[in-house]
Amino acid sequence: MADCSYAHNTIKKRDTTVISSVDLDPAAIAIEKANKTKIYSDTLLVNGNYPDQVTRSDKFYDTLSKSRSWVARMLASLLVASHKDMDDGQTSTSKLATSRHYFQDFSGCVITQIKVVQANVFARAPGVDPGWAGRFLDNVHMLTQERVLRRNLLFNVGDTINAYRMSINEQLLRSLPYLATAYIVVSRRPLYPKEVIVSIFARDSWTISAGGKWRGHYYGDVFDRNFLGTGDELCLRYYLPIGEQLNGFEGQYTFNNFFGTFTNVKVVAGVGGSNNTARMEASRPFILPSDHIWGFRAGYTQRNCDMDTKDTTINIKMAEYALWYGYAWNLDPRLGTVFYGMFSTAYQHYYNRPEVGPMLNPFYSTTFNVMASFGFSRQNYYQGNMIYGYGRTEDIPYGYKFELAGGYQWSETRGRRYYASLTALWGNALGRGYINLAGRIGSYWTREQSWEQGVLDVSARYFSPLFKLGHIYVRQFLTFGATWGFDRFMGEREQINFTSLRDVRGIGVPREAVGCNRATLNAETVFFTPIFLYHFRFAFYLWGDVGFLGYNHMIFDNPFSSVIGIGVRIKNERLIFNNIQIRFGVALCRPGPYDFNWFDISNESTLEVDSFRPSVARPIEYR
């Protein structure tokens, strides 16, 4: 039987503990769980993977910190951390582990106490100075309120341990945007083996940031994803008066997990010459096997939109209203298999738009939709690291989803028509890596039995186990995607291009060279390095992309593009910023009208594997 008494003894007697550099050693909690799960839990372990480089690096850093130059000393203090500071060391695991295995040893035990252990953004182990920058940021940062963490728990004192529910809850905590990491540790009471104490460890992220868009629509924004430690999100955006765009201001506030209901409520209000918005939406996702999903959206939007088929911008005005509800029935409490049903309705009315007709720009037609879906779903999680992150524990879903959907649409230009779709998803870890497969097909049809605006989309994603190459860890990634459009119309959203998810990186396709069918294959070999500069980690990668885009349904007979290159991604898991990506490429083959950009610096969101959870019933997107 599992015994977590060591972890229990290291936790202070009070229910809430805030870790500082002179307080509790948080590594004890992580080490204890690591020993039980065979997964090193990312953020609190000393880095033992690179002993030679750590020793050499420490000598260099010590020399730099003792330099006579005040500039060198300042840089060493601000930017460089030795392995002693690396309390979230990049500890690797070459295999995925099922997240619920750790909790199965405690199944049926009664929870007698729930403790919360919190760490500030840059808090270190005892005796380790985070440096003046870390101390300053921790002092400025407002720690997440304890009640915010507790209302994200799916269990209470007096409940019995359910391994599946606990693993779902741990993943839920780690997915919160204001936490750098979170995990759950269970310890038995010394004299009462059927009673346990549950300890929640959570380390905050630095959640204040800024961003913007400098192409097409120009704006800058500042946001806080943990406003005043409440877990809510605040975003303020200013639209710059450049070109045809006028001054504009927009504010967004999101109440996350509103009053502990796991419902997120978002309010958006904006005013300006070309951007006016008033919108409110609320949504509650599926979380547990037997659960509800519901939501609504209502609002008015006026915004400049770039047209895909013409070199012009049109000020779009629209009102939209949507409502959805669903329920899932648990068929297997141990594995989380569910049968679910879903209902949704949506109305969109356009006041200003491009020209529309029976076969032109159906995307901008006023429509009323009613849809229903049902299916089977199962989702569990593996835990690993150095996949899409840079050392923190990552939750990779595995399972399946099979869904049938259908409905009715009234369109001002097409009249009454019907819709049907089929979705099949599957993902799991095999002997030599993880594979995720997806297939979707859907189409409208009219009372005259004519099929229209059909789409078929298939995809496959693979990543290999983690290999060690000297002091570097290597993982191989492959992604394939193919999309066919059938009986499409003319105008906006009726053709497709390369996108951020289905891309040949660096290739630019002009408007006159898009198509209805597309296939892409992306390959990456990623090298996770031991380079560590004040929690910024570096991953270098070799990449190659091929793509086909055109109107031929024999998809590999369409115009062909091929690119190879190298790049580096830089990520600080403690900060809310996206990855910084620097990429170089060479085009091996591209059609004459295509553009190519051999160099790019960008912000890149961390990729995620498709979820198998039930979702809102809606037509399959053609994108």
Give the location of each predicted region.
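Residues that define the transmembrane beta-barrel architecture of outer-membrane proteins
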Residues: 214-218, 245-249, 274-278, 315-323, ...
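Sequence/structural signature of outer-membrane beta-barrel proteins
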Residues: 121-123, 207, 239-243, 256-258, ...
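C-terminal transmembrane beta-barrel domains of outer membrane proteins
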Residues: 6-8, 48-65, 402-408, 415-623
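Outer-envelope beta-barrel architecture signal
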Residues: 110, 194-196, 206-208, 230-234, ...
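Transmembrane beta-barrel wall of Gram-negative outer-membrane proteins
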Residues: 255-362, 366
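Outer-membrane beta-barrel translocator domains and adjoining extracellular loop/strand segments
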Residues: 248-251, 277-283, 295-297, 306-312, ...
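Periplasmic polypeptide-binding modules associated with outer-membrane biogenesis and secretion
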Residues: 9-221, 237-239, 248-252, 273-279, ...
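Transmembrane beta-strand segments that form the barrel wall of outer-membrane beta-barrel proteins
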Residues: 153, 202-242, 249-255, 261-273, ...
